Structures are given as C-alpha cells and as structure tokens.
A protein has these predicted regions:
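C-terminal segment of classical bacterial N-terminal signal peptides
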Residues: 2-8
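Short glycine/proline- and aromatic-enriched beta-strand/turn motifs that initiate or cap beta-hairpins
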Residues: 8-76, 85
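Outer-membrane beta-barrel "beta-signal"
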Residues: 16-18, 163, 190-203
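Transmembrane beta-barrel strands of outer-membrane/channel proteins
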Residues: 17-25, 76-82, 119-125, 170-174
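Flexible, solvent-exposed loop segments that connect beta-strands
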Residues: 27-53, 81-101, 127-149, 178-190
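Residues on the lipid-exposed face of transmembrane beta-strands in outer-membrane beta-barrel proteins
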Residues: 59-67, 102-112, 121-123, 155-163, ...
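Repeated loop/turn-to-beta-strand initiation elements of outer-membrane beta-barrel proteins
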Residues: 70-76, 114-117, 163-170
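Trp-centered recognition loops
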Residues: 150-154
Length: 203
C-alpha cells in the first residue's frame, strides 16, 4: 500500500496599520503618470522667484488588508495624507497650500524571510485649500480657493521589514493629481513624487 500526500499552501489574511511621513516633491515628475502643472511657474513670472522649494512633509496614515498564499500576497489598501505649507515670493506675495488626500487601490506583496517588497496602484480623491495674497501695483489682493481632484492616479513601490508584530515600512509613491486653479486658469500639482518612512503594526 502506498500513500500519496498533497501539500497545499495555507491561505492567511493579514492587516497592517501604518503611520509614516517623509518628503513629497510637488515639482517632481509623477513617474510614468502625466502631469501638466504650470501654476507656480506662472506666479514666479508675476511675483518673482519662489523662496522655498516645492517640497512638503505629508503625514500619512494607512490601512492594508491582504490575503497570502505561500510567499505571494495581494490585497487592498487605503491611505489618508495631509500637508500644509506657506510659500513666499520675492515681491512679498504669499501662497498657503493645504491638501487632504485619500488614496486607495490594490497592493501585491512578496513575503520574503526578512522583508516584504510590494507594489501598489490605484486612485482616490484630493481636496485642497489655497489662500493667495498677491501684490500688484502696490495693492494687495487676497483670495481663498477650494478645489477637488476626483480621479488622481498613483502607483508605489516599497517594502516592509517585520519586527514581530511591529515593523518598518518605506515607500516611494508617484501621484498624478492636478488641480485647476480657478483664479488663474492654471494647474497646480497636489501629487508629485514622495519618499516615505514609518512604522506599522500587523494583526
């Protein structure tokens, strides 16, 4: 009598809660995604050079749920990010930019022995508040503009390094989220390229 056994990969479900931050460059290319930002360039032509870089520091909270079969896993993720920055021009004009983004999509993991590299892509929503204080002919004009990007696109690459239930996560994201600024009929990039580091808890 001969017994034949069949080995099957056991499916497991995992969830990650993450918090991370880093640098998001609004002027950088969105990788393979298109962008048509020209708002800041137009303002520099009118109000002089921008004194700060177009880099912001977002705070990001993310939740990932995925199913693993062996060393391969796939699932769904959502991230909520927020940033705010004040920009100054050489003629004294100022611009305050505040954005709140919700990004969601699919993630794919490889579960290695010491790290879990991943790739993700998806869409979401951005809302923004722009406060303009611009000088022209010795007079100051102030305005507040609210806007929304309904279908931003993103993709990301990164890895998680598990340390028992906790771990370290780093990610590079490419986001195309161009907002039409009604006051100037120009486009401002709310996305760009971001490099993020943080911690996660798995359960």
């Amino acid at each position: 009598t001969m017994l034949v056994g069949q080995a099957q990969a056991i499916e497991q479900t995992f969830s990650y809660l993450s918090i991370f931050s880093g640098i998001q460059d609004l002027s950088a290319s969105s990788g393979a995604l298109s962008s048509k930002s020209n708002y800041f360039n137009s303002l520099e032509g009118e109000h002089g050079n921008l004194k700060e870089s177009r880099k912001v520091q977002p705070l990001v909270v993310g939740f990932d749920f995925y199913r693993a079969s062996g060393s391969v896993a796939s699932g769904f993720g959502i991230e909520i990010l927020r940033y705010k920055k004040l920009f100054n021009f050489s003629d004294g004009s100022q611009l305050s930019l505040e954005a709140l983004g919700v990004l969601y999509g699919f993630n794919f993991y490889y579960r290695g022995d010491f790290w879990f590299p991943f790739f993700g892509f998806g869409t979401g929503n951005y809302t923004s508040k722009i406060q303009e204080a611009f000088y022209a002919s010795d007079s100051l004009t102030e305005s507040t503009i609210f806007g929304q990007v309904d279908t931003p696109l993103y993709y990301k690459l990164g890895a998680r390094i598990p340390l028992n239930s906790w771990g370290i996560v780093f990610s590079q994201q490419f986001i195309s989220a161009d907002l039409d600024v009604a006051s100037s009929n120009k486009h401002i990039a709310l996305g760009g390229t971001s490099t993020l580091f943080g911690l996660y808890y798995g359960f």
